[in-house]
């Protein structure tokens, strides 16, 4: 007996008005993730995934392109307001926030969540080049 054709249902995107942009700016790369208030990821992009390799990956321009791509990925959710959480000392901190602002999001507040040890692990030895 022939099986009935299976129709794929189109997933309905939930509408989210407020989101949280998590920016992880390391010395080597910048990762931008936009989540809803509960922390469920809606979209993400990286400088390396945006076509930058090697030392170009750790530039402010690469971080800006990653932020633009992430903003484009979450446009369909209807996010208007963004809360920004910045982590890390990388060169892409400022340019990522500027790119998100230019993408049409209203940035409500910016928080630095860089982990600072209370004299935790011993740091690695100094580089000798």
From Swiss-Prot:
Query: Do you know which InterPro entries this protein is assigned to?
Result: Ribosomal_uS11 (IPR001971), Ribosomal_uS11_bac-type (IPR019981), Ribosomal_uS11_CS (IPR018102), Ribosomal_uS11_sf (IPR036967)
Q: Which UniProt keywords apply?
A: Ribonucleoprotein, Ribosomal protein, RNA-binding, rRNA-binding
Q: One biological process GO term for this chain?
A: translation
Has UniProt tagged this entry with the keyword Lipid biosynthesis?
Answer: no
PROSITE patterns linked: RIBOSOMAL_S11
MF annotations from Gene Ontology: rRNA binding; structural constituent of ribosome
- In the UniProt record, does the keyword NAD occur? no
- Pfam families associated with the record: Ribosomal_S11
Please name the SUPFAM superfamilies in this protein's record.
Translational machinery components
* Any one GO CC term of the record: ribosome
Q: Which family does it belong to?
A: Belongs to the universal ribosomal protein uS11 family.
What is the protein's quaternary organization? Part of the 30S ribosomal subunit. Interacts with proteins S7 and S18. Binds to IF-3.
Please describe what this protein does: Located on the platform of the 30S subunit, it bridges several disparate RNA helices of the 16S rRNA. Forms part of the Shine-Dalgarno cleft in the 70S ribosome.
User: What HAMAP family does the record tag this protein with?
Assistant: Ribosomal_uS11 (MF_01310)
Protein's recorded name:
Small ribosomal subunit protein uS11
Provide the organism lineage as a comma list.
Answer: Bacteria, Pseudomonadati, Pseudomonadota, Gammaproteobacteria, Enterobacterales
